[in-house]
Amino acid sequence: GELLRTLKAGISNNKIVFSGVGKTSEELEYAIKKDILQINVESLDELKLIIKISKKLKKKVNLGLRINPNIDAKTHSKITTGTKNDKFGLDIETAEKIYKNYNNNPNIKILGLSIHIGSQITNINPFVRAFSKITNFIKKLNKNKIIIKNLDLGGGIGVRYNNERTISISSYAKNILSISKKLKCNIILE
C-alpha cells in the first residue's frame, strides 16, 4: 500500500503518519515494525487491534486519535468526512474516554490528534470551526496533564477547476499559525 511505497521512495519512517479507515492487521503490523511517527486511530476497535499487535510484537507504538469534530465542510456529501453521520474518526467524548482508559497502557503512547473534515473545501469557515474545536479539546487535555505532541490537520482545500471560488493559501496558513501559537505541539499537514 501507500506506506510501503512511501518507504521505498526514501521517506524517513520518523516522518510518516499512517491514516485512513480500513487498515488491515498486516498493514498495522508492518507500520509498527517500521517505527513510523504515528498511526492515526479511527475507532475503538482499531485501537484494540493495534494494542493486540503491539503486544505480540513487544513494541510500543505511537498513536494519534482521529477526532470527528462534527463540522459540516459544506462540500459534496460523498467527500465530507467530519460530521457525526460520517464513519470517520472518534467523537470527542469517546476520545476522552480513550485517554482516561488507555493513556497508561504499556503498549501504546497516544501523542497526537488528527482531524480531517473533507475534500474540495472552498470556504475557510469549516476549517476555522474545526481548528477551534480541536484547539479547545487539546487545552482541556492539557489541563488534565495530557500532552499532545502532534496535531495532524487534514482536509482538502478546494481546487479551482473553472472559475470556482476557493480558499487562499494565506488565509489557511494564517489560521494554522494562530493554532500553533496557542498550542505547544508539532503541526502536521497532509
Model-derived regions: residue spans:
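Anionic-ligand-binding alpha/beta catalytic cores of soluble enzymes and soluble regulatory domains
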Residues: G158-L189
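Active-site-proximal beta-alpha core segment in soluble small-molecule metabolic enzymes
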Residues: G1-N150, N175
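Flexible glycine/acidic-rich beta-alpha junction loops that bind and position SAM and/or redox cofactors
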Residues: I71-T75, K149-E164, I188-L189
